[in-house]
Amino acid sequence: MSSLRLLISDSYDPWFNLAVEECIFRQMPATQRVLFLWRNADTVVIGRAQNPWKECNTRRMEEDNVRLARRSSGGGAVFHDLGNTCFTFMAGKPEYDKSVSTAIVINALAQLGIPASASGRNDLVVETAEGPRKISGSAYRETMDRGFHHGTLLLNADLSRLSNYLNPDKKKLQAKGITSVRGRVANIHDLKPGVTHAQICEAVTEAFFAYYGERVAAEVISPDAFPDLPGFAETFARQSSWEWNFGQAPAFTHQLDERFVWGGVELHFDVEKGHITRTQLFTDSLNPAPLEALASRLQGCVYQASALQGVCEALVSEFPAQAAELREVGAWMAQAVR
C-alpha cells in the first residue's frame, strides 16, 4: 500500500470539508502522508480559541448568508470564497514537519512562475514593487503521534469583502479572545494572470509527489453522499453545530444600552461557552418589573438572537400591559447579538 494519500473535495461546504479533514486526521495510519485539496464558498473561518462575536461582523454575515466555521487549529480569522484554494498536509511523527509542506507549496508556486518565500511563522509572500504581499496563510495542529498543516492560497479572492466580515463594530464588546492580525495581501491572479484553481491543485499535487518520490490516484470526496469515513456523520454534525462554531468562544462580556421612548435600558452580559452566566440591568423605566424579570430569566440563556427574543415573548403573558415594550427590547437585543 502506498504511503501517500491524495484527496480532492468537490464540496464548497466548509463544515463538510473540515469534517472530512478531521476524520482523515484522526484515522490515518501514522506512516501515511496525506494531501487534501479543497475550497469553501463564502465563509469566515475562525481559529479554535477565537470569539466569533469579537472577530466577525456576525450581523452582516447573516445578512449576506456567509457561514461561520470554527477549525480545530489555532490562529486567526480568515474569509474564504471560491477564489481561495485550500490545502492540508498531514503526516505521522516524527516525520511531520511543517517546513516540508511549506517547501512543497513554494515549489509548486515556482513551477507556475510565482516566486514565493516564507515569512514569519505562517505566511507566504511575494515581493512586488509596493513591497511584500501575502498570498498564503497557514495554521497547524499537532497531537502525540501526528500533525497537520493547512492553509489557503489567495488565487482570485474578492479582497474587498475581507473588511465586510472581519471588522466588527468597535463598541460591540470586550473579550478575552485572540485578535486576528490582518496583513497586506494580494491575489496570485494579479501577480500571474490566468492561473486557475485546477492549475494550482495540479502544481501542488505534482510537488507533493516529487518530494516523496511516488504517485497515487486521487480520491474525490463528493457532497452528494457522505464519505465512507467512520464517524463522519457525527463529526459533520458537530462541525456544523452552533455549539461548536459559536458556543466554543472564550468567555467575554457584552454591554448593551439603548434609549426607548419609555426609558433607557442598559444590560451587561457575561457569556461563557455561548450561554449567559450573569446579567446586570439598569433602567430608568417607570415600571421596571418586567425588565427585572427579563434580567433574571436571561441567566443560562443561549446567546442567540432567537433565544433572547423568545425569553421576552414568554414574559408577555405575565406583563401584558408592557407587551410592546418587551417586544421592542427583544428585537433590540436580537439585533445587537447577530
Curated annotation (Swiss-Prot):
GO terms for molecular function: ATP binding; lipoate-protein ligase activity; lipoyltransferase activity. The keyword Chaperone does not apply. (R)-lipoate binds at residue 134. It is an enzyme of class 6 (ligase). ATP binds at residues 71, 76-79, 134. Pathway: Protein modification; protein lipoylation via exogenous pathway; protein N(6)-(lipoyl)lysine from lipoate: step 1/2; Protein modification; protein lipoylation via exogenous pathway; protein N(6)-(lipoyl)lysine from lipoate: step 2/2. This is Lipoate-protein ligase A. It comes from Cronobacter sakazakii (strain ATCC BAA-894) (Enterobacter sakazakii).
